């Protein structure tokens, strides 16, 4: 029984590390590109945003992973087709990340128009790339040898 508890704790630790790594890397790269090229923010504003976002991403990575896994379990209950997973990934990403992203931009001093432009752009791009993050997260979980959400019991 004790080894099961240790394995479970180790699995949770690996899951947390994988989720954190994926969140920090993905959000830094994608959001910096959005902020500079689509939202008209300066490099310095975007860099400030990303520096504020890293500790935030570290804090929200595990809750997001749990939130996303919930969406995945619900999608699996509906059916086990690939498009259902894609939609669940998109919905989880957009509904969780958009309010967090808006708050980060507000904290670094972006004006209302920049916030709306960045969050709106991020939402549109997330509809195309939200599933990409899901696949990236799954990849990171495999790298960290985490039991994938498909293998977990609901």
Curated annotation (Swiss-Prot):
Keywords: Amino-acid transport, Cell inner membrane, Cell membrane, Membrane, Transmembrane, Transmembrane helix, Transport
Subcellular location, principal: membrane
Membrane-spanning ranges: 21-41, 51-71, 90-110, 115-135
GO biological process per UniProt: amino acid export across plasma membrane
Cellular localization per UniProt: Cell inner membrane
A Pfam cross-reference name: AlaE
Membrane topology: Multi-pass membrane protein
Protein known as: L-alanine exporter AlaE
UniProt source species: Escherichia fergusonii (strain ATCC 35469 / DSM 13698 / CCUG 18766 / IAM 14443 / JCM 21226 / LMG 7866 / NBRC 102419 / NCTC 12128 / CDC 0568-73)
């Amino acid at each position: 029984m004790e080894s099961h508890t240790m394995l479970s704790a180790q699995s949770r630790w690996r899951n947390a590390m994988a989720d954190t790594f994926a969140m920090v890397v993905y959000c830094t790269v994608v959001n910096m590109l959005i902020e500079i090229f689509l939202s008209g923010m300066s490099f310095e504003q975007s860099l400030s945003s990303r520096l504020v976002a890293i500790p935030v991403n570290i804090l929200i990575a595990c809750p997001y992973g749990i939130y996303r896994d919930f969406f995945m379990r619900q999608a699996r209950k509906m059916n086990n087709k690939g498009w259902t997973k894609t939609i669940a990934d998109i919905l989880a990403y957009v509904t969780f990340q958009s309010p967090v992203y808006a708050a980060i931009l507000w904290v670094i001093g972006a004006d209302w128009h920049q916030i709306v432009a960045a969050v709106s752009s991020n939402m549109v791009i997330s509809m195309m790339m939200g599933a990409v993050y899901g696949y990236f997260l799954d990849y990171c979980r495999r790298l960290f040898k985490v039991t994938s959400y498909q293998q977990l019991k609901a």
